[in-house]
């Protein structure tokens, strides 16, 4: 360790008992980071870091392909997807592959193709990762200057940012092209209970698209999570894709302005912290989106949302008791409010009882029964269709509640089934991942700022209390 420029810089790094453990320019002595610090050893080895990233991409794509094939192998077409613990097939079905009217799976072959394509891609990425980690050049700056970089080269960093933005924009347009030209996507709002359709009449009005961003995030408003038609979703992807591509070109062609050079920390760890913050925000938004939105995440595949299951229960018992002779328009509940129907604070007719808090819910099986002032009493008496009764009874018993041991549904509900909704899994996992990414952002941002300010060091070992204590033996 005597070759280090400054020992103090590494006081917080646990030293190895065997200082001879060397990894060809990636050992603790030359990098200041021990083996468990992972990619930190590769901060200045762009070629090896490329290998780590490509191999990581290979692992991700391998999981996608393997899990995809696993779900195909276990899939039972007669049961709804959300009863089978599937999290990948619902995404493929939402994109319009293999499904027909009502979300019924008519062909599992596209799912098989998807899994195989991902597996083959992962093999290519895996080979590239191993090549660059073990055989390729350690650094790219000399032999491939276009792919080389220095972390504090602000112009190069914004060029890399621009390339990433263009790739994200292309990704957004892939969804647009799928919806417009390549078979369409699944629309849960299609007449007659959902179907795959091409989205022709895109919403491109900036006041509508950016109006979502200006909405309140709270009940009844719901910010961007409140989007409930595919024209807006696909139109939003046109806007997003265009902004990403033009922003990417802008960042490639320009250098950072003086205020940005002053305001930001320009180091590898700082960029890591910015990325973690962005991913954290994405995780939290995805959590709310999959929990509340039944247009981007159709209930036919993901199961009902919480509010949807609750309103479905109120609807199911309204149907039952109306058949038994109850006057649902005037029956009084135990609190003195309407038992089946009541008015919201703004005057709409809504379901009564505990589900009143979910009066915002919009769902394809319920909307036909609404009039200009909320639920329409005459439609509730005359127009309820058998498919609406079946759908609501199914959703009532599949609430997205449940513990890890798969005792799903409302704890007191005798008709609940043994299942956990994919909505529960996807929203809780994205919340937890978003939280940990945020903690990682705080950690790396703190370290990056400290390093930039020049006071990055661990506990000061020179004046550590234990040094003045009597030896144990």
From Swiss-Prot:
Where N-acetylthreonine occurs, the residues are 15
The record's keywords, sorted A to Z, are: Acetylation, Chlorophyll, Chloroplast, Chromophore, Manganese, Membrane, Metal-binding, Phosphoprotein, Photosynthesis, Photosystem II, Plastid, Thylakoid, Transmembrane, Transmembrane helix
Listed under GO cellular component are:
chloroplast thylakoid membrane; photosystem II
Could you tell me where this protein is found in the cell?
Answer: Plastid, Chloroplast thylakoid membrane
One of the GO biological process terms: photosynthetic electron transport in photosystem II
Pro-piece positions: 1-14
Write down the Gene3D superfamilies for this protein, in alphabetical order: photosystem ii from thermosynechococcus elongatus (1.10.10.670)
Q: Where does [CaMn4O5] cluster bind?
A: 367
Source species, domain of life: Eukaryota
Instruction: Cite the Pfam families for this sequence.
Output: PSII
Which spans are transmembrane here?
69-93, 134-155, 178-200, 255-275, 291-312, 447-471
**Assembly:** PSII is composed of 1 copy each of membrane proteins PsbA, PsbB, PsbC, PsbD, PsbE, PsbF, PsbH, PsbI, PsbJ, PsbK, PsbL, PsbM, PsbT, PsbX, PsbY, PsbZ, Psb30/Ycf12, at least 3 peripheral proteins of the oxygen-evolving complex and a large number of cofactors. It forms dimeric complexes.
**What is this protein called in UniProt?**
Photosystem II CP43 reaction center protein
Phylogenetic classification of the source organism: Eukaryota, Viridiplantae, Streptophyta, Embryophyta, Tracheophyta
